[in-house]
Amino acid sequence: MKTVSQLIDMKQKQTKISMVTAYDFPSAKQVEAAGIDMILVGDSLGMTVLGYESTVQVTLADMIHHGRAVRRGAPNTFVVVDMPIGAVGISMTQDLNHALKLYQETNANAIKAEGAHITPFIEKATAIGIPVVAHLGLTPQSVGVMGYKLQGATKEAAEQLILDAKNVEQAGAVALVLEAIPNDLAEEISKHLTIPVIGIGAGKGTDGQVLVYHDMLNYGVEHKAKFVKQFADFSVGVDGLKQYDQEVKSGAFPSEEYTYKKKIMNEVNNND
C-alpha cells in the first residue's frame, strides 16, 4: 500500500500517479488487481450506483457504507473517501466529528473535502491526525451555483485558484484534486506545490490522473465528459443478459453442463 510519503516521492521523481474511483467490493478488487496507485470513493456514487441526479442527495451514511466495501475489496491500496455535502461547513466541532467518523469507520487512508473555504477544517483535521485531500476547480457539490463548466478560465479566477491551492497545502492537505481547469494552469499549480496534484479534466501537467470507474469502462453511464477516455466497454454485458433471457425462455439454459448429476427421486419414491 502506498503511503503519503511514497506518493510525494513519486511526485518528486516525476512518476505519474494513477487514481480511479471505486464504490463497491468487486470494483475495488479489480482496481487493486490492476495495480492502480489510489482509489477514490467519490460522492459521484450518487449518480453512478445510486441513480441520483447529482451528489447532493448523498449522505455520510452512504459514504461510510460504500467506503467499507471498497476497503474490503482493496485492502492494500491507498483509499480516499469523500466527505459528502453537508458534512463540512456546519460547525467545526460537527465537521471534525463527521470527518473522524468517516475516517475511522471506513479505515480509509485519507478523506477528501471540496472547496477553498475549508482551509480551517483542513488545519484542524490534520491536527487530530486525519489526512485530508483537497479538491479545487470544478467541485461537484457546488454545481448548483457554478454549473458543469471549465473553471479558472479568466485571469482573476486563475490567480485565485493558484492562491487557493497554496492555501490548502499550507493548511496541511496531503494531496490536491484539480478538476476541469486549463491545462497550463494545472501544470503551474503542480509545479509550485510539494504535495501530489491529481487532475481530472486538467491536462497532463499534473502529478497524476483520476477517472470515474463507470465512465472509463462505459458501465451504465449515459453521458461522459469531454475529458473521459473509454478504456473498455462493459456495456457488452447487456448482450449477455439478452442471451440469458433468450436461453431461459427457449429452455436451452440450464443444459446438462450446468446441472447437478445426482438423481434423488428414485430413493424418495422407494421410501413410500
Curated annotation (Swiss-Prot):
One of its GO terms (biological process) is pantothenate biosynthetic process. The active site is at E179. CDD domains: KPHMT-like. GO terms for cellular component: cytoplasm. Its EC number is 2.1.2.11. Pathway: Cofactor biosynthesis; (R)-pantothenate biosynthesis; (R)-pantoate from 3-methyl-2-oxobutanoate: step 1/2. It comes from the Bacteria. Keywords: Cytoplasm, Magnesium, Metal-binding, Pantothenate biosynthesis, Transferase. Mg(2+) binds at D43, D82, E114. One of its GO terms (molecular function) is magnesium ion binding. Binds 1 Mg(2+) ion per subunit. It is found in: Cytoplasm. It catalyses: 3-methyl-2-oxobutanoate + (6R)-5,10-methylene-5,6,7,8-tetrahydrofolate + H2O = 2-dehydropantoate + (6S)-5,6,7,8-tetrahydrofolate. The keyword Nucleotide-binding does not apply. Its cofactor is Mg(2+). It is an enzyme of class 2 (transferase). 3-methyl-2-oxobutanoate binds at D43, S44, D82, K112. Its main location: cytoplasm. Belongs to the PanB family. NCBIfam families: panB, PRK00311.1. Homodecamer; pentamer of dimers. Catalyzes the reversible reaction in which hydroxymethyl group from 5,10-methylenetetrahydrofolate is transferred onto alpha-ketoisovalerate to form ketopantoate. This is 3-methyl-2-oxobutanoate hydroxymethyltransferase. It comes from Staphylococcus aureus (strain NCTC 8325 / PS 47). The gene is panB.
